[in-house]
Amino acid sequence: MDDRIVDNNLIDHYEVEEELSLRPERLSQYIGQHKIKENLDVFIQAAKLRNEALDHVLLYGPPGLGKTTLANIIAHELDVNIKITSGPSIERPGDLAAILSSLNAGDVLFIDEIHRISRVVEEVLYPAMEDFCLDIVVGKGEEARSIRIDLPPFTLVGATTRAGSLSAPLRDRFGVHLRLDYYDMKDLSHIVSRTADVFEVSIDAQSVQEIALRSRGTPRIANRLLKRVRDFAQVRNNGLIDIEMTTQALNLLQVDRYGLDHIDHKILRAIIERYNGGPVGLDTIAVSIGEERITLEDVYEPYLIQKGLLERTARGRVATIHAYEHLNVPYVNEKRK
């Protein structure tokens, strides 16, 4: 899959570093996800009043909505250290044991993509989360014996885009489950304005709204689009970001007013023009546009469904009447019979 301007995953190391500079450090600075903020504030204050580690927290939802940011905020609000790792990087039980053994009382351990840890590693997590201990097997064969090592109380914050892929025993060990949803226009506009202030760029209110509109409900994409519009403004408009420059830049980037790019259009057109709007199987669509099935399912499909452009049925994927309207394709009802 080629890098997309509307990809809600981080693209490269440079973008990782730049995003870190934009992240808030306190709940009061965090924009959006209001119910989550309110609940977390109560849970954190209660844990501090009892002088206990915060219950383990599971953050789930689409990429780019602030799960890593929230994990860091939790650590800041608790005034403790945070250790950051990811599911794929914990290959063996010993890797996890080493990380857990390095934690101090109250620390936060953040595991991104926690759904990707192996079942063998998961087994080590169970007693660590439940009883704050490690069960280590020493020796081999008949001489093998289990040794229990006590751990200081800690908070595990797990993040995933695929909560359904977590095993039930692991999921049930999280005391706090928080789902992050796509952002509304008001909160996204606030984020674009704040980022513009950080970058010290001049931008009008219409441009803020236009960038927010095309950001797929995702702060990471909003910030990325602002950076690219800033590039166009710097080269072609003396650094001024007005609505004319913004519209021109976003159109050149092939991001429409639904936040769809050329690949989204390609998917919808394949369903409509080649398969009469569906239903059509995901494998068939993948072959038609030259993408992998898992990429379609995880990256492209969720937003198209969320925008009401695509339906997932038992017989396959179906383009909705809204997809026809958006692409200016005549909708003939007989096609669907």
Curated annotation (Swiss-Prot):
Region (Head domain (RuvB-H)): 257-337
GO molecular function: ATP binding; ATP hydrolysis activity; four-way junction DNA binding; four-way junction helicase activity
Catalytic activity annotation: ATP + H2O = ADP + phosphate + H(+)
Top-level enzyme category: hydrolase
Transmembrane region(s): none
Region of interest (Small ATPAse domain (RuvB-S)), ranges: 184-254
GO biological process: DNA recombination; DNA repair
Highest taxon of the lineage: Bacteria
Principal location: cytoplasm
Binding site for ATP: 22-23, 64, 67-69, 130-132, 173, 183, 220
UniProt-listed SMART domains: AAA
Keyword 4Fe-4S applies: no
Assembly description: Homohexamer. Forms an RuvA(8)-RuvB(12)-Holliday junction (HJ) complex. HJ DNA is sandwiched between 2 RuvA tetramers; dsDNA enters through RuvA and exits via RuvB. An RuvB hexamer assembles on each DNA strand where it exits the tetramer. Each RuvB hexamer is contacted by two RuvA subunits (via domain III) on 2 adjacent RuvB subunits; this complex drives branch migration. In the full resolvosome a probable DNA-RuvA(4)-RuvB(12)-RuvC(2) complex forms which resolves the HJ.
Function in brief: The RuvA-RuvB-RuvC complex processes Holliday junction (HJ) DNA during genetic recombination and DNA repair, while the RuvA-RuvB complex plays an important role in the rescue of blocked DNA replication forks via replication fork reversal (RFR). RuvA specifically binds to HJ cruciform DNA, conferring on it an open structure. The RuvB hexamer acts as an ATP-dependent pump, pulling dsDNA into and through the RuvAB complex. RuvB forms 2 homohexamers on either side of HJ DNA bound by 1 or 2 RuvA tetramers; 4 subunits per hexamer contact DNA at a time.
Record note on domains: Has 3 domains, the large (RuvB-L) and small ATPase (RuvB-S) domains and the C-terminal head (RuvB-H) domain. The head domain binds DNA, while the ATPase domains jointly bind ATP, ADP or are empty depending on the state of the subunit in the translocation cycle. During a single DNA translocation step the structure of each domain remains the same, but their relative positions change.
The protein's name: Holliday junction branch migration complex subunit RuvB
Organism: Macrococcus caseolyticus (strain JCSC5402)
Gene that encodes it: ruvB
